[in-house]
């Protein structure tokens, strides 16, 4: 790297500063590129996380709905049993009256 001392002092930069900058500029560029890639992947991950969260919420809603239906089905089964008992009593009563 050819750095003219007069040009460096005219620009206000010390030759050592220019050397350090030239050595680090490649690394800084790669760091900047890595940060941009991380931001992009973070955005993709956030979108995917939102999709997964919505999917889990939908599944939880289905499970809750199914559980509430189970309670209603159990209630209907109990009512059916009670109706069967009442029908048997009624048949006994009708049978005893007709005899």
UniProtKB/Swiss-Prot annotation:
Function: Component of the biogenesis of lysosome-related organelles complex-1 (BLOC-1), a complex involved in endosomal cargo sorting.
Family from the record: Belongs to the SNAPIN family.
Membrane-traversing stretches: none
Coiled coil: 34-94
Protein location: Endosome
Keyword line: Coiled coil, Endosome, Transport
Protein name: Biogenesis of lysosome-related organelles complex 1 subunit SNN1
Presence of keyword Ion transport: no
Gene: SNN1
One GO location term (cellular component): endosome
Keyword Repressor: no
Organism: Kluyveromyces lactis (strain ATCC 8585 / CBS 2359 / DSM 70799 / NBRC 1267 / NRRL Y-1140 / WM37) (Yeast)
Subunit structure: Component of the biogenesis of lysosome-related organelles complex-1 (BLOC-1).
